[in-house]
Amino acid sequence: MKKSGRITHRIGVALAAFALFGLTATIASATPSTQVWIPSTDIQPYKTVHLNFDSYIRTGKEPASNVGYFGIPDGGNLAPLYSVGPTVGVLPFEKIKAEVGFDLLYGGANTPAGLDKYPLYGNFKIGMPEDNTWIPAVAVGMYGIGTKSGNVNNGVYTKTGTNANIYYGLVAKNLPVVGRLSLGWYGLNKEASVAGVYDRNGSEGDDNGLLASWDRTLSEISDKLWVAIDYQGGKNAYGATSFGASWAFAKNVSVLIGYDIYNNKDRAGQNTATIQVDINFP
């Protein structure tokens, strides 16, 4: 995966809220060790401090139906979303590892929704690494742990909230030649406007879904080149198919360039290009 082993990162970008009652859409998330978009089973080593600097840039203008929903002018683009934050390995054991972290998120739909005032999102993960037998890597955790509680009434977000509080479980296994395959499930708090479970018409989407990914270091070309494709299911602001490639410029520094295709643009907005810079200390 992009972090850990190499370098690891993750940001879940969440959009949504409601134009009714003056509530505009929002964008939010937090970042454990990830693939391009979804969490991975990678966990930061003990005392390793990982810093991520991520940007998500919209590649198209929002359709007229999304203008009020996201609080932007007719025919406008959502502003880029920026995320920065640390993740730290906290357990000294070989067979069980854990990491904790937080992110500060600014821009995107958070700005018109007034949620730049609540930029802090937490994350944590605990799991077991893969061994050299048949036993896969296993990880469970949470991300997108926001500080502002939202509320929904009859399908309408009556109060914006950043507390998506996404919980998940994953298993992963490396296969010769093929690379690593990961599979899991997630759930979230549908009352958080950033989760976008309800659309502007009050139609309910999904508050849980599939997680799946493939990633591989392309050592045939260079040990510095890593690629991945991942999928987060569900009709909400987080559902997306993403792909990207990362280059390790140093032992502890990598840069990923990727693209996110959202499952439901009424809830998540237009697709995004992403640039993610990851640095490990020491």
Predicted regions and their residues:
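A short, polar/proline- and glycine-enriched secondary-structure boundary/capping micro-motif
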Residues: A192-A195, G239, R267-A268
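A short, compositionally biased micro-patch
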Residues: L23, G89-F93, N174, N236, ...
